[in-house]
Amino acid sequence: RSSYSEGKRIVECLCASYAKEYDVPVKVARLSQTFGAGVAYDDGRVFAEFARCAIEGKNIVLHTEGKTVRTYCYTIDAVTALLTILAKGQAGEAYNVTNMDTAISIYDMAKLVSGILPESNIAVERDIPEDLASFGYNPEMIVKLDSTKLQELGWKATVGLREMYERLIESMSLVH
């Protein structure tokens, strides 16, 4: 499962090498998980699954302990970050794009989402299979990107996690 992250590292290395060899002003943006209004209803990522459960009034069922922690970024914030990097970033530098205030575990995110539509009356359950390893879930990890370097260019995330979910759920509800 690490091929995705390793692939990103290789591409970043190739860009840096090409930039040095051919004097191209490459700037790298490392985006955290990004979402917001407009995500497809059938998107397979965990944040979309949680939103669908809220919309459909189904309990959120976790098949792990939900201890993995990540940071997230709202789509529009990600776009403004990319524009900031293009306009003000230094060639040869990498910038993390994330809202550092959104760091949350999968379990706590499920709890957050379960309370966004109180009328749904959904709960968070854990149904951890005995043969968990055979399901291919990522190991528990903490992925907290630090966007301080990007903020020093004048960028600031504007949408928090709860509002990200409120907008996502509203958007997904329109197509459900």
Question: Which residues fall in each region the model found?
Answer:
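Conserved beta-loop-beta element that borders a ligand/cofactor-binding pocket
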Residues: 12-37
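Active-site loop-to-helix junction immediately N-terminal to the catalytic Tyr of the SDR YXXXK motif
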Residues: 1-3, 17, 42
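Short coil/turn segments at alpha/beta junctions that flank glycine-rich nucleotide-binding fingerprints
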Residues: 7, 21-25, 88
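Hydrophobic alpha-helix immediately C-terminal to the catalytic Tyr-X-X-X-Lys motif of short-chain
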Residues: 10, 14, 18, 50, ...
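Short, solvent-exposed loop/turn segments at secondary-structure boundaries
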Residues: 38-42, 137-139
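Active-site helix of classical SDR
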Residues: 3, 7-10
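C-terminal substrate-binding subdomain of Rossmann-fold SDR/epimerase-dehydratase oxidoreductases
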Residues: 54, 58-176
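Amphipathic alpha-helical segments in well-structured domains
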Residues: 43, 47-48
